[in-house]
Every structure is written in C-alpha cells, then in structure tokens.
Curated annotation (Swiss-Prot):
The keyword Protease does not apply. Could be a 3Fe-4S cluster-containing protein. This is Ferredoxin-like protein. It comes from the Bacteria. One of its GO terms (biological process) is nitrogen fixation. GO terms for molecular function: iron ion binding; iron-sulfur cluster binding. It comes from Azotobacter vinelandii. The lineage of its organism: Bacteria, Pseudomonadati, Pseudomonadota, Gammaproteobacteria, Pseudomonadales. The gene is fixX. Keywords: Electron transport, Iron, Iron-sulfur, Metal-binding, Nitrogen fixation, Repeat, Transport. To ferredoxins from P.putida and C.tartarivorum, ferredoxin I from A.vinelandii, ferredoxin II from D.desulfuricans.
C-alpha cells in the first residue's frame, strides 16, 4: 500500500502565475477566529497558520476539492473559482 504523499506526487500542476483561483478577502478576519479550520482540513496543505495568528494561502498544489470553500462558506471571507482552462491540477490516476 502506498502512502498518500506518493499518490499526490503523481499529480501535476500548471500554476497560473499572478492569478490565484482562491483568495482570502480579509486576512485580518481570519486572525480574529479562534480556530483556523482551513489549516487543518485542506488536504493539500495550502493554508498555513503563522505565529502571529494570520493565515497564509499558497494555491500552488491545490487539489480543487472545495473543502475550504465549504468551511469558510458562513464567513464569506473566501473567493473561490475554478482555475482558467489549462491551469490547475492535472490528475494522473483519475
């Protein structure tokens, strides 16, 4: 049985430089939250909790699963759209 990291390594990404498909509208809003659920639930690890409480987002390697969109739905603090055609994740095994 192979590890999840080995399977994810098979996937490829075409990064759309300067045009991320996910954006945190107000980073200060995330600082005010006691729990930063996106930092725990994102399977690709795109969200990182900094020591000062801020949440940083790097969309390179995003699996486009929509988990963060569901988690942050109530706050409305996340802009999420599909990447432009030809960009984003390229799944090798389905």
């Amino acid at each position: 049985m192979s590890k999840i990291e080995e399977k994810l390594f098979q996937d490829r990404y075409r990064v759309d430089s300067g045009r991320p498909h996910i954006r945190i509208k107000d980073p200060d809003h995330c600082t005010e939250l006691s729990e930063k659920q996106c930092t725990v639930c994102c399977p690709a690890g795109c969200y990182t909790r900094e020591t000062n409480g801020k949440v940083t987002l790097v969309t390179d390697g995003c699996l486009e699963c929509g988990t963060c969109r569901i988690i942050c739905q109530d706050s409305g603090n996340l802009e999420w759209e599909w990447p432009r055609g030809g960009f984003g994740i390229l799944f090798k095994f389905g």
